[in-house]
């Protein structure tokens, strides 16, 4: 029984609760839900390290200066975010919270200075040591309903403010860069759109087959060079950030049962938990989705592809279902992703 006399939650119920918070982007609540429970068994650290595969860092590229106009717009976005911070969100590795940063809004000069710092960090206009210290995150191991782990990075408040500033300022550019087949970023009610569109397609053509794909550890495995190249082509306004944030090794920390933090290094992918990561991942995936769509249309003109981050669904005539499956798997492998065969489904 629970301390209050009620029934204790099972591990599966706890995992479902945390997973629901994650799906609603309530990372702070998910983290709080985890840390109040008993720590995971030993061996979690090794499992987490294995989920951050090594890879080559992007080659250095020159990035032009940010115009005064764009800088002013970014500062305005940062000021807004400093004034409406989320309450009781979990802190990053250095213990700083949004409430600490929110206090600067009580003084106009401090407010402006803090916004300038957020923008400088977003554009990489600070020392390498400062970047490294504030790009790192606390890693939490959230257990999925199937018993496997999901690594969640709870970054510094400065990083989260900078990421949200970039998302706010580049909202339309990000939406266009993600492409027409991505429904998780820049789309209002994107999940509902996918569901209703697929329902309509299958009602109109009941002989079609729906194939669902899920990529294993997708955020942590996409090559950073691929992301950088995609951003340069599709959303060049984000290049200063991507060059500064992804061109060096990121060091995260995991606190186990003791009080000592163990480092976890990342040289591939983007951090699941950073507000900018879904956009960067989706931009990196956009060209692959376009190629999948063209490949499917070559098999059957009525074919369609839909993506909700790394969850990909295709609707094709049953006669070309096997060929469509092969085309999707090969294309995703080409961008460094591995389809989880155990989660592949057809109906």
Task: Outline where the language-model segments fall.
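Residue-level marker for buried hydrophobic side chains located in beta-strands
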Residues: 211, 307-308
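Extended, charge-enriched "interface" segments that sit outside catalytic cores
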Residues: 8-32, 38-57
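Short, contiguous pre-domain boundary segments
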Residues: 57-65
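Conserved pre-catalytic core of RNA-dependent polymerases
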Residues: 1-13, 17-22, 52, 64-284
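Polymerase palm active-site segment centered on the conserved acidic dipeptide of motif C
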Residues: 237-244, 304-306, 316-347
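Short amphipathic alpha-helix segments
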Residues: 282-295
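Short beta-strand->loop micro-motif that forms the acidic, two-metal-ion catalytic signature
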Residues: 311-315
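Short helix/loop segment immediately N-terminal to the Walker
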Residues: 294-305
């Amino acid at each position: 029984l629970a301390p209050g006399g009620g029934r204790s939650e099972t591990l599966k119920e706890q995992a479902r609760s945390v997973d629901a918070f994650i799906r609603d982007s309530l990372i702070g609540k998910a983290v709080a839900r985890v840390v109040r429970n008993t720590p995971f068994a030993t061996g979690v650290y090794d499992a987490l390290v294995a989920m951050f595969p090594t890879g080559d860092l992007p080659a250095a590229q020159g990035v032009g200066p940010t115009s005064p106009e764009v800088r002013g717009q970014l500062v305005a976005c940062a000021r807004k975010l400093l004034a409406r911070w989320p309450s009781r969100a979990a802190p990053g590795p250095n213990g700083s919270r949004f409430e600490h940063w929110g206090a600067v809004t009580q003084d106009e000069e401090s407010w402006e200075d803090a916004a300038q710092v957020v923008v400088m960090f977003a554009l990489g206009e600070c020392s390498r040591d400062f970047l490294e210290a504030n790009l790192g995150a606390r890693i939490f191991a959230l257990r999925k309903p199937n018993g496997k782990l999901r690594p969640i990075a709870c970054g510094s408040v400065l990083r989260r403010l900078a990421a949200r500033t970039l998302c706010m300022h580049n909202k339309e550019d990000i939406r266009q860069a993600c492409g027409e087949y991505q429904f998780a970023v820049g789309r209002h009610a994107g999940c509902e759109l996918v569901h209703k569109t697929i329902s309509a397609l299958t009602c109109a053509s009941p002989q079609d087959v729906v194939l669902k794909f899920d990529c294993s550890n997708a955020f942590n495995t996409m090559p950073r060079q691929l992301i950088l190249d995609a951003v340069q082509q599709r959303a060049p306004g984000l290049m200063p950030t991507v060059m500064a944030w992804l061109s060096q090794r990121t060091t995260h920390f995991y606190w186990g049962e003791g009080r000592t933090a163990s480092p976890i290094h990342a040289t591939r992918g983007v951090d699941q938990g950073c507000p900018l990561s879904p956009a960067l991942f989706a931009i990196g995936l956009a060209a692959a989705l376009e190629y999948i769509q063209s490949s499917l249309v070559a098999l059957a003109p009525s074919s369609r592809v839909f993506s909700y981050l790394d969850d990909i669904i295709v609707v094709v005539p049953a006669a070309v279902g096997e060929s469509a499956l092969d085309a999707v798997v090969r294309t995703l492998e080409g961008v460094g992703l591995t389809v989880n065969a155990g989660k592949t489904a057809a109906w």
